[in-house]
Amino acid sequence: MENMAEEELLPLEKEEVEVAQVQVPTPARDSAGVPAPAPDSALDSAPTPASAPAPAPALAQAPALSPSLASAPEEAKSKRHISIQRQLADLENLAFVTDGNFDSASSLNSDNLDAGNRQACPLCPKEKFRACNSHKLRRHLQNLHWKVSVEFEGYRMCICHLPCRPVKPNIIGEQITSKMGAHYHCIICSATITRRTDMLGHVRRHMNKGETKSSYIAASTAKPPKEILKEADTDVQVCPNYSIPQKTDSYFNPKMKLNRQLIFCTLAALAEERKPLECLDAFGATGIMGLQWAKHLGNAVKVTINDLNENSVTLIQENCHLNKLKVVVDSKEKEKSDDILEEGEKNLGNIKVTKMDANVLMHLRSFDFIHLDPFGTSVNYLDSAFRNIRNLGIVSVTSTDISSLYAKAQHVARRHYGCNIVRTEYYKELAARIVVAAVARAAARCNKGIEVLFAVALEHFVLVVVRVLRGPTSADETAKKIQYLIHCQWCEERIFQKDGNMVEENPYRQLPCNCHGSMPGKTAIELGPLWSSSLFNTGFLKRMLFESLHHGLDDIQTLIKTLIFESECTPQSQFSIHASSNVNKQEENGVFIKTTDDTTTDNYIAQGKRKSNEMITNLGKKQKTDVSTEHPPFYYNIHRHSIKGMNMPKLKKFLCYLSQAGFRVSRTHFDPMGVRTDAPLMQFKSILLKYSTPTYTGGQSESHVQSASEDTVTERVEMSVNDKAEASGCRRW
């Protein structure tokens, strides 16, 4: 009998019932047998006395038919459980249906209509909640069912206590029939979930996969519409879950806009040297980067967008047609695509889309410009990138494995980059030098050297752009610039280790600080190997600034200007671009930009051919004029070295004080409160103390502090250094 009662409570399903259709529920089954259901016409014609109570409906006829979600087509009606409602009033109406006026979208418990004016809960069996007055029932529905519901797209999935059949199959694949307690019914896949937290995670997984309607129940459902995003006058279609790389094939990150604009300016500056350029976006995803190249640079570039995923390749082709760019596979298809071009439609350019492994493609073809932006580290693709890159070509590498580069996962950095790293105050520049060192080693293995044009390390990525110099001599010169760094753990002073193969007896003498003599134990560690040379090319950065002004990229102009100040190691107030006799001076937005006349196609030989000795010599002279004296490596954080009990000066004033003291100084993009200078740490803290004011004076004038003797200043600096060292030592040990 218990099994029979459970069977009576199981939901009964009927197919193809209209939304507005009115039904009279069939009588409950008895223990003797279950009669066949009468046809709809018989049910409609059956008289119902007004005085007699309505017959009891079938127990737990739960999953009645209802229209599917608004996003589904009308012909694909999906079944919705009665526990899924839009408003609390809809849930209350289930319990107050009288005299055969039953909504086809609802199904009632057999105890809904009891003697008198008592009603039973439509979502609870009689054993759990007996029939009661209307005000009690409303309070029960609101407190027990509605308040603990899960909301999704305007619907509320309320908690259900009916003994419904589990829809989710077991491990073998069969559906288990077992008695269930409180549970939820999923509006998307009709699965039964017991806990609310599990239901939230279940719905969230549906959203991550882009499943926003009942695709499991509906016979025919349309795919979720693709969203169209616009960046730099380029439209791209993206999937609903485009921001989650683990859940989508076409990952698109809006936070990488600065990265895309920097690479575009790099390519635009290179296009002024020689045309046309063979460009490769090795990991296309949505193809946004290659589309911007082809749309704004036109015939100056020949763009190839590659991706290994078939869905991404299809999406790239759709985005090409969306931006009126023709997809070229071979010459025949190019001719056909030109014939298909509609009247009045303008062909902005051609893009070659390939579905191939990036390593295989870079081995098969040679390029002038290669951009690598894999998901994670890029060390697996560096050897292939330098294998066929043309002479004086450019390779840009975007690394998003910031957990290892920023010393959060040190063992991963040792595994991928073969370097030792710890968390320091200059960890972002340390990450950039680690990536450049890996790029330099990969180029040297292919008998090529590199010249670093710029390196940027921001919150989400590390971008390194290098120019390739062919020849074993350039490779040897590049390899010599990879050195180890000695870092003091007490005061965070640092210096690159001297060249030589001989083992030094006391490497602590290379550090400017005397922490090893005043502190117990070993005070310094060896980091690296790292890139020890310059990270910026001033001449190339100025050309990038001109391209950003020319194309109206306002977002990165401030960043490029900061890079120029950093490469010259000069304060912003002293920034100026001097024009020479062979330089065209242009003014745009109040900034003077120079463009050289000798950077034309005459200075470069055709694709893949080597230069003559005379042209290589001229190029070397040009590079020497572009690059000024190398900037000092690394920087100091002014907050980290502030004096206890003193109000430090403003950063802009402090830069002037360091410059007046005879040191090179500039701000850095790696740290908003960082100061790049060639001053030792002791001098840095001495000047910082000299122009700081005591906190208890309430804004004491600087002249009083400057009148202190040099001996007193030195003593206080040493005391502050020792205090900082002891504090940092306590944290480390």
Curated annotation (Swiss-Prot):
Which residues, renumbered to this chain, carry the PTM Phosphoserine? 66, 612, 707
Q: Where in the cell is it found?
A: Nucleus, Nucleolus
Positions with a binding annotation for Zn(2+): 488, 491, 513, 515
Q: In which tissues is it expressed?
A: Widely expressed.
Composition bias (Low complexity) maps to 39-49, 57-73
Q: Which PANTHER family match?
A: N 2 ,N 2 -DIMETHYLGUANOSINE TRNA METHYLTRANSFERASE (PTHR10631), TRMT1-LIKE PROTEIN (PTHR10631:SF1)
**Trm1 methyltransferase domain sequence ranges:** 227-688
Known SUPFAM superfamilies for this protein? S-adenosyl-L-methionine-dependent methyltransferases (SSF53335)
Q: Please name the gene that encodes this protein.
A: TRMT1L
Give the EC number(s) under which this enzyme is classified. Answer: 2.1.1.-
Its family remark reads: Belongs to the class I-like SAM-binding methyltransferase superfamily. Trm1 family.
Q: What is a single Pfam family found in this protein's UniProt entry? A: TRM
Function noted in UniProt:
Specifically dimethylates a single guanine residue at position 27 of tRNA(Tyr) using S-adenosyl-L-methionine as donor of the methyl groups. Dimethylation at position 27 of tRNA(Tyr) is required for efficient translation of tyrosine codons. Also required to maintain 3-(3-amino-3-carboxypropyl)uridine (acp3U) in the D-loop of several cytoplasmic tRNAs.
Cellular component terms, GO, for this chain's entry? nucleolus; nucleus
Give me the ranges of the annotated region Disordered: 1-78
Q: What class of enzyme is it?
A: transferase
Composition-biased stretches (Acidic residues): 1-18
Arranged from A to Z, the UniProt key words for this protein are: Isopeptide bond, Metal-binding, Methyltransferase, Nucleus, Phosphoprotein, RNA-binding, S-adenosyl-L-methionine, Transferase, tRNA processing, tRNA-binding, Ubl conjugation, Zinc, Zinc-finger
Query: Residue positions of the PTM Phosphothreonine?
Result: 26
The keyword Ribonucleoprotein is annotated on this UniProt entry: no
Q: What is the effect of changing residue 512 to L?
A: Found in patients with early-onset neurodegenerative symptoms; uncertain significance; reduced ability to maintain acp3U without affecting tRNA guanine-dimethyltransferase activity
GO terms under biological process: tRNA N2-guanine methylation
Q: Which GO terms describe its molecular function?
A: RNA binding; tRNA (guanine) methyltransferase activity; tRNA binding; zinc ion binding
Q: Per its record, how is this protein called by name?
A: tRNA (guanine(27)-N(2))-dimethyltransferase
Q: Does the keyword section mention Transferase?
A: yes
Chain ranges of zinc fingers (C2H2-type): 184-206
